[in-house]
Amino acid sequence: MQSKNKSLFQGHARLCVSTWLMFILMLVATSCDRRQLWDEWDELVPVDINVNWSKSRFAEFDEGDAPTGMSVYAFDQTGKQQPAVMVTNDLEHVQLKLYDGEWNIFVFNQSVMEYASLQFSGMDKYASAQVETIPQASRWFSTSRAEWVTRSHSPWAEQTRANAETRADEYSLTTKQPIWFASDCHEGVIIDEDKIIREFTPHTRFDDGTFYTKSAIIKMGVKVHFNGYENLYTVRAVISGVAKSYNISQMHALTEMTAHELTGWKGTAVTDSTGYVETTFQTFGLVKGYSYKPDELYLHLDVMLVDGETIMTYDLPVGNQVRVSNENDIDLIIEVKDPLDLPKVNKTEEGNGFDITVSDWEDEINIDIDL
């Protein structure tokens, strides 16, 4: 009888312990910090993005077309979330939905998939987002300047030698001129608990929360004077040392350099024996930290004379000849004022015609000579 009572007591004890354990577990479970079960979209805050393109200068560049869309990137300053990205055909307004917190936001025209001469990288981080030009083959330049690149101490040549990918491909010394690209950004956009944007700290120093886009591309002019101008038939050229990339959030060119082939040359005779050639090109501008030393920019110029055979080759340090242009549609200009002397040669039977084919003048670029 005593053994039976003992067994009943042990059973009741185990039941009580189990009951208390279940009760404690239920208390712990109900006290956990759990995410609410309603749609998380309700936790997001509507943020109105207004964009003004009036000073972005799109009409001044070769494309000349107004933007047809824009991209908006918003980055949580904690870095715990992926950027919120919105691509839209609306150019003036878009609404994002973001969590409470502090955000950095930038906008730019079009989407990353719509640029034929640009590529984007680092777009998952606000500080690293950048755009850069893409390689463009220039057989004549890579062939004719291969030795110069290997021995030159210009910053661009040294950077090129240090770049294994560029060195592996002899025809990737140049990149395409960038097409028009404009952007603006706001840092420290605070979205508080009352779902009100409290503060904007824009790079453009506006405080109304509107993005005022600015062109990342500038237009540079090149002008070269000649003695013996009557002997000039055609020219081709490359400018090396200009900026290859642009930081979107910092809104300035980076230190990486590139070279662009220059086309669209026009020639003007000043006297019977003097004249000049000129053109313009589009670029991200001068690299960050540019100091206007001669070897920071080089103009690589080939001049074919009217005999159709003689080619004069020049590698001109022009980094100290950059100045602000007085022309409305040109930002900076490089002018070689000391005339280059061209020797006297006999004209071919075709005269100054542009139909002469020379075997070692690949990708011939003609100029209009105004006599």
Locations of the language-model features?
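Acidic/polar, low-complexity intrinsically disordered N-terminal segments immediately downstream
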Residues: 34-143, 323-371
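Short, low-hydrophobicity acidic/polar segments
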Residues: 81-214
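Sec-dependent N-terminal signal peptides
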Residues: 10-23
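Solvent-exposed loop and beta-edge segments used for protein-protein assembly and interaction
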Residues: 41-43, 97-101, 203-205, 212-216, ...
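A sequence/structural signal for flexible, mid-protein segments enriched
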Residues: 168-271
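C-terminal motif of bacterial Sec signal peptides marking the signal peptidase cleavage site
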Residues: 28-31
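Tryptophan-paired
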Residues: 69-120, 232-326
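N-terminal secretory signal peptides that target proteins for export/translocation
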Residues: 1-13
